[in-house]
Amino acid sequence: MRFAVLFALALLGAHEYSLGQSTQSFTNPIIAGFYPDPSICRVGNDYYLVNSTFSYFPGITVFHSKDLVHWKLIGYVLNRPEQLNLDGQGVSRGLFAPAIRYRNGLFYVTCTLVDIGGNFVATSKNPAGPWSNPVWLPQINGIDPSLFFDDDGKAYIIYNSIPPDNKPLYNGHRTIRIREIDPESLRVKGDERVLINGGTNIEKKPVWIEAPHILKKDGAYYLIAAEGGTAGQHSEVVFKSVNVEGPYVSYQNNPILTQRQLNPKRAFAITSTGHADFVQTESGDWWAVFLGCRPYRPYEEEYYNTGRETFLAPVRWNDGWPIINPGHEEVQYRYLYPIHPSTDSIDIPTSGNFRSRDEFDSKELNLNWVCLRTPHEKWFDLMQKKGYLSMRLRPETCAGSMNPSFLGRRQQHLSGSASTALVFNPKAENEKAGLLIFQNEKHFYFLCKSTEGNEPVIQLYKSGSSGNSTSGMELIASSLIGKDQGENEVLLRIEAKEDKYSFSYTYDSGRWIVLKDSIDAKFLSTRVAGGFVGCMYAMYATSQEKESNSVAAYDWFEYSGDDEVYK
């Protein structure tokens, strides 16, 4: 499949961080859009990074980079239905907080499949895959597992778990625990130990200590973890010990990363930073990847539709303790490159402003496209109509809890657009195909072609159950387009401008017809919709709980991002 990058990323002129002699800077976030909970490892001069994917399939993104800045999606850990069944799972359930590690020619990814199987390990000799089926760890009671391989050959698994005796002292009281694990058989052994009870200072009732990782430096063990919850109070903290199993001492200057103390009205705010992982370059420098959020105006109200994104910042060691983002309070949109910039080609940028177009002219779907939950049958095809993505209409809907005919890619910018060209001849009013902007089952907008009284029509639906509703949607705008256009290709476009979406269509690409302008985008924000994901633009076709043999064919899909902060 050919993706043409039509507009390269533009870097903003903001604060710079002086590191070494380099004069080139990179743009944060390094992986924009809904790519949360990053974990990273280095093998030689190659870097690999994974993210949470919740109930999207394939599960657990695997990125590769040579310079920590330019990232290419190379595969998924769980890309076979027998590895991962997400039937019935809410969008913000599924796969939580993976961690990637490497030992003796083998990559390990640990993760939690919440509500279903619990914690597991998957392995592969090639990070691009294929990966093994999950090896389940029923003895590990908790979430956010991470492996640590010590110098003596022993391996440990660290995770977030229940309070001592499962008796919380306050809401949000959790522990960090450790158990030894056999790196060959992946069997847990030995006794469980509590490393951290509550957080940095239990007398102050710290909440949601989670996402632990252990690293070793100069003979000392460092445990880093997130604290404060994933919203505005999010932070990263560190503990230190001379023994891997503790006791651990909290750093007196914790947290080592947070934005919670800053003016919420500051322009182009980066908020909710935490859930970090460390990596050391070949030259010995340390860097941290972590999640953060970018609200749109008014910044202090914390509305964002792009989800939690992956950021990169330098780490400085001071008197035996690490500090993320040294010399700054605010996380920077620009830092100097950690490594000489790579010249490797990237088909789709992950940072800055860009435009990309998918022509659907390959035998395989580009890795950027994801399904909503696990597909159990073949419902899309790239060869049925050459140069088109053909999608069968099926009874499942995006408001349900199964796998609809839905192929999505992330909204990676506060301002931008998604557009597509659709060939579709609906045979009944329940048949609809088009372009979706989707947050979760109860928060989405659907711009589609359908039929009304035997006349072709362009419709805009909002998720909901009031008014003129069908299958979890409420009709908010429509336009009859005439039978002479019924079988012609129609172009559909959704434009995002921070807190507004606009919906347009055309049969002539030079003259867009606005169906509905300036619709509330806050309705799809994390603050309103809840959960842990960000918005997806999706090609979506449904027959709304009825059987159908109709097919929708998409000629191309174009995504464009144009955020002010990068200009």
Protein language model regions, located:
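Bacterial Sec-dependent N-terminal signal peptides
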Residues: M1-T23
